[in-house]
């Protein structure tokens, strides 16, 4: 049963300043949702709250499978993931970095290897699997972050500024990765981006953060 997310009346303030203000939305359909909005409008905050990294001050963040509410336990957390613009790298191979999410989830070795190799192929980094991750370019690092997330086959994938500070060539590669994931149609991807043209290229559903709320555009 596909995972759905409903947020309602979500409020979040930092140091007394409201960032999310009774923000509500239902992520019901598989595909790509693109969230745009000015700097500081709360996009990253919203992604962290949706990905269960942070809790709202008020309001509800509810995951459903069909019509059943799913408790926010480790099993649910294994089905969702957030990729941040500067992913943390470990001083080891590209393969080990991409395998990290699966290893902490206790994946079996053979299965882990298959999934990680597939994810590295998907993002065009398989030829670098034995290289030290610290030698990658910023575009490749961004792709490695996506591979690490894809290896766990998330049903809900949150990408925060996936092409921030990478060149046109790598932006195109990352966009193609996202479009290819979309073709597979198995997951929901929620992307925060400043780039309106990119939003148009990738999104099935366009969302705008405005005054602490999501507006569908
Ligand atoms: N952990 C935090 N502590 C204090 N203030 C925070 C924290 N996280 C976010 N903020 C503040 O909340 C507001 C919204 O920040 P957020 O990062 O969610 O916006 P954004 O839309 O992602 O911005 P950008 O486009 O620059 O990435 C900003 O004013 C930011 O300074
Ligand atoms: Mg942000």
Q: Model segments located where?
A:
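Conserved ABC ATPase signature
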Residues: 132-136, 140
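Helix-to-loop junction immediately C-terminal to a conserved catalytic motif
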Residues: 51
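The feature captures the beta-strand-to-loop junction immediately N-terminal to the Walker
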Residues: 36-38
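Conserved ABC ATPase "signature" region
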Residues: 110-128
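Catalytic Walker B motif of ABC-type/P-loop ATPase nucleotide-binding domains
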Residues: 157-160
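ABC ATPase NBD coupling module
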Residues: 67-81
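H-loop/switch region of ABC-family ATPase nucleotide-binding domains
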Residues: 193-194
